[in-house]
Regions:
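Extracellular glycan-interacting surfaces
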Residues: 1-207
Length: 207
């Protein structure tokens, strides 16, 4: 459902109930406009869920989605004043958890780029090296990229793919640097969906 809400079911979808209000602290001056992405927690955390929302915020639930707490590392990120919404808003549209490192996770925000946490979400590092943004004076900024989708290789978590507003990229060093791939036969760089077939390591995207 589009909007600032989450519906959850405890019986396989026969009935649904709304989560308690998904809100932000008054001091932030922000309100939740829409929810964009829900990611389940790790197998050892079956009641944990992560939620990405507009305006570029991340939430965590440890009670199967009944209540949600905002991630302060994202909410108070020192670069936030330089984030700006794309056509769909300032949306946190991808969340990925490293299956080997219990403290490492990634979020993508359009238009802020990809951020990585190595301490369980307390702090976040922009990881956008070599990722272009054609509309900015600096074509390779530290932040500001419009990432539409991020995926992590399930068996090689150091490898990431992203479908960007301006291209398709791959990283082999946990987002430390990126290589652009859409010049290798794709009809265009713009798109939204991307998926991985890990055998034999074959990505597919739409443009």
């Amino acid at each position: 459902m589009y909007g600032p809400t989450v519906q959850r079911s405890a019986n396989g979808g026969k009935t649904w109930e709304r989560s308690k209000k998904i809100g932000l602290p008054a001091w932030s001056g922000l309100t939740v406009n829409a929810t964009w992405h829900i990611e389940p927690g790790r197998p050892q955390e079956p009641a944990t869920l992560y939620l990405g929302a507009d305006p570029g915020v991340l939430f965590r639930s440890d009670d199967a989605g009944e209540t949600w707490e905002p991630n302060l590392g994202i909410l108070q990120h020192p670069t936030r004043e330089h984030w700006f919404p794309g056509a769909g808003g300032l949306c946190c549209d991808s969340i990925q958890l490293d299956p080997r490192d219990p403290y490492r996770m990634y979020v993508c925000i359009a238009s802020a780029g990809t951020l990585r946490s190595d301490d369980g979400g307390q702090t976040w590092l922009p990881v956008n090296k070599n990722v272009a943004h054609d509309y900015l004076p600096n074509p390779y900024p530290e932040i500001g990229q419009c990432v539409h989708k991020l995926l992590l290789h399930p068996a090689r978590p150091e490898r990431l793919w992203q479908q960007n507003h301006f291209g398709v990229y791959r990283s082999d060093d946990c987002g430390g640097s990126w290589e652009r791939l859409d010049g290798n036969g794709l009809p265009g760089g713009f798109g939204f969906p991307i998926m991985i077939d890990p055998r034999p390591d074959r990505p597919a995207g739409g443009s």
